[in-house]
Amino acid sequence: MDQKLLTDFRSELLDSRFGAKAISTIAESKRFPLHEMRDDVAFQIINDELYLDGNARQNLATFCQTWDDENVHKLMDLSINKNWIDKEEYPQSAAIDLRCVNMVADLWHAPAPKNGQAVGTNTIGSSEACMLGGMAMKWRWRKRMEAAGKPTDKPNLVCGPVQICWHKFARYWDVELREIPMRPGQLFMDPKRMIEACDENTIGVVPTFGVTYTGNYEFPQPLHDALDKFQADTGIDIDMHIDAASGGFLAPFVAPDIVWDFRLPRVKSISASGHKFGLAPLGCGWVIWRDEEALPQELVFNVDYLGGQIGTFAINFSRPAGQVIAQYYEFLRLGREGYTKVQNASYQVAAYLADEIAKQGPYEFICTGRPDEGIPAVCFKLKDGEDPGYTLYDLSERLRLRGWQVPAFTLGGEATDIVVMRIMCRRGFEMDFAELLLEDYKASLKYLSDHPKLQGIAQQNSFKHT
């Protein structure tokens, strides 16, 4: 054997990964790599790059889960090669999916299904779930208008401050979005402004049960009652879809007396994130319809796929079944009792943070993390006319130096001059961890006080309100 080949072969077998030839070059980023490399070297390169990501457990901007127990990891590993869409090939995974749909429908007080199976589907998140709910609204509205012999070319959707997915829905499906703007002192959709935006071309009204900007609930019942009066006055019947991305897996456990779900007759569909307060890993959402009549059959496809026939009304197709299976694990593992305990713990942390932060500066709280107010989030602004010598951007930047990702951002609509800070509390952010945040919060304030020349230089950062 050629001596050079022998040397190269020996090196590939025996060299430490940090002595390997492949690791001495910059990893390819613009062209498809020409040559292979050892698996341990490729892993090391990628693993090292990922250290530059933020620590997910310290990410207090995200609504998504950042803690999962070992059994979830095991179930995800077992399901990594199971395609969720292949119902015939993976019938038990499909059965688990249907069980979850029934459980979520029961949680949200959907009427008992005629055939024993609730109407709904798993999605990759609440955004896809919103798209499906919006499509069904448009189709139902169009059918009503066609039956009345009226034009269907100018549909509109009425909402308050919503996630970006509703802007996408409006653009992709050619619907006018009538978003009730945030105003100082009026940050959410109210019955009066909602009714002013409605007409016979309104396909539906979408309250956000857990507004992403602040964490507060947009309570559906007052809006629902206003739509009842609107119909009595005008004859126009308008449906509701509840975007419960966060609140859908909170209120049923910690604030069951809030009437927000299918107990309201106008609510035809509800969407939520399983991977937020549903406690599932990333990539899980749910949309449930009141009954079969609420989901137009034109949106349901029966297709041949890999030897089987399936009915599907999701936008996405192939994806792992692990997220659904992990969601089912959480439902079984915790039940109503366990979910109530976990969610209450997050609210207790939020209340503690709100109380302690209130002592640190001239703050006005928009959300204090009470179960009857919204999700377990703390959102506040500097009081009008107060100048503590720093901005919330400065504070956010200082906290980030300690690894904490606490967003400061402006509100939307007509309230863009209002800067808020928002802290999300969720499973895994326990009381002791919150105390560490407070210590760094106080240290950051002291630093800003001791270095006044640095105050006010931080710019609006890249955090998004979602």
UniProtKB/Swiss-Prot annotation:
Tagged with keyword Cell membrane: no
Swiss-Prot/TrEMBL induction comment: By acidic conditions. Expression is regulated by a complex system involving RpoS, cAMP, CRP, EvgAS, H-NS, GadE, GadW and GadX. The level of involvement for each regulator varies depending upon the growth phase and the medium.
According to its UniProt record, which protein family does this protein belong to?
Answer: Belongs to the group II decarboxylase family.
Its name, as the record gives it, is: Glutamate decarboxylase alpha
Please name the SUPFAM superfamilies in this protein's record.
PLP-dependent transferases
* Gene Ontology terms for molecular function: glutamate decarboxylase activity; pyridoxal phosphate binding
Q: Which organism is it from?
A: Shigella flexneri
Pfam families with a match to the protein in the record? Pyridoxal_deC (PF00282)
Its GO biological process terms?
Answer: glutamate catabolic process
Q: Identify the residues that bind substrate.
A: 62, 83
Gene behind this protein: gadA
Its UniProt entry gives the catalysed reaction(s) as: L-glutamate + H(+) = 4-aminobutanoate + CO2
